[in-house]
Amino acid sequence: GVEAQVLSNSLNTMIDKINELLEQVKTEQIRLRKAEFELLQSQINPHFLYNTLDAIVWLAEAGEQKKVVSMVGSLSDFFRISLNQGQDILDVKEELQHVRSYLEIQQMRYQDILQYEICVPEELNHYQIPKITLQPLVENALYHGIKNKRGKGMIRIEGELDGEDCILRITDNGKGMTPERLEQVREGIRNRNVRETDIYGLYNVNERIRLNFGENYGITITSTYGEGTCVTVRLPQY
């Protein structure tokens, strides 16, 4: 009698717990799909595409054939990886190729103000990363950091191992953020209801990393006004 009752109660508790977990998984899957869909929408960004095509036409008219070929190749690579046959997770190596294509295009457009370096050790190449993690971070560095400063700006992408975790850093020597603005951005990255477009891109990147790999992973930001900004991406061994 009593033992059967205890067993029955335990089973009921366990079933409740399983249902709760299933509900949680379902909710997280929906959030992940939503984040991925919104990301894809942002990738098919008409401004970026039109501006790049404009630049290609301008180069062609100026007789810069080599640059035209190079830019068309970069644009093609950029969209090929963006739309990567529905795969949501890539190797770091492929993700770096994607962001390199983006930077090659932007460097041709902003050659007076943009330099970049990608320095990531090969041992990180096989780590897994949600597709289109780095490009939105680099875009932010360009449009909010580099374009708002005087003179030439530098964007660096570096990588290292921290224990078994993969660390990727995107650093710019742009305008940087005031402490108040930095706090706003950090809050926005954690807030599902963030409305500000500039912060939403960062929230989306962080959300997809956390939903794929867990709460211990994602992005963190440091910034000094007048000196620049650094975004750190942490990924697990997968």
Predicted regions and their residues:
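C-terminal beta-strand of the catalytic ATP-binding
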Residues: 233-238
